[in-house]
Amino acid sequence: MIRYWHLTSLDAPTVALVWSLAFAWATHVVLPLWIPVLLALAAWVVYVADRLLDARMALRAANFDCLRERHWFHHRHRRLLIPLAIAAACACGYIVFTLMPAPARERNSVLAAAALAYFTRVHSARRLPSRWLSGFLPFFRKELLVGLLFTAACVLPALSRGSGAGQSPVPLSAAASVFALLAWLNCHAIDRWENLDSGQRSPIFHQGCVLALAGLLLAVILIPAQPRAAALVFAAAVSSLLLSLLDLVRARLTPLALRAAADLVLLTPLALILR
């Protein structure tokens, strides 16, 4: 079951859904149903498109080594996935233009433009000159940009509603910062695991432990005044520690199982929102 959860690109939408609801839980905010639905649909469309385009470009260049099982799955089932993705994209458009308030639409257009620019940069046949890229956000790598965009999409609904109700944005921003680092670690770990031999040393274990320790310390600081934000930071720390443990046992897992597990361990906030 977890195998197809990953192969059908349902993993990222699930993570987006869980964390958006968790951020809302941390701020005592109830999100309208259309918000998590929009996030899940949009994430699924983006990931399906990303994997289909990756497969198409690699097959055209006869670069089969960079293709993983998820890419082959999407290529084999493209006649089903493409119409479904188009339908999901249309549903997203309907939600945005009929249910989303105009001020929120204006704010989110900035995030959408940034995501579109990144997506175009990654999949454009004519890449931007390297000197342009080095002069613009030279610190950011692909994994960090993905983590920041993903986090922004998940936290903005709760952050805007919490701020509108007079809540301080600091606790939720702190939790979002930890989640952004966790999302980066997830992407970085996947990249390292897929490009290293199982016997090669990986930095993921130590990086995950450092992030887990930082998260635990932040959770302790937040507990007295913001117990829910502290609990969410603690959940992120547990996820980080689980990524470290996956790094230790990666030689015993198949690449597909390892890739699916890397996203599965991000669902720790379920323990908070379902209790």
Q: What is the meaning of each model-derived region?
A:
Residues M1-V45:
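Non-cleavable N-terminal signal-anchor transmembrane helices
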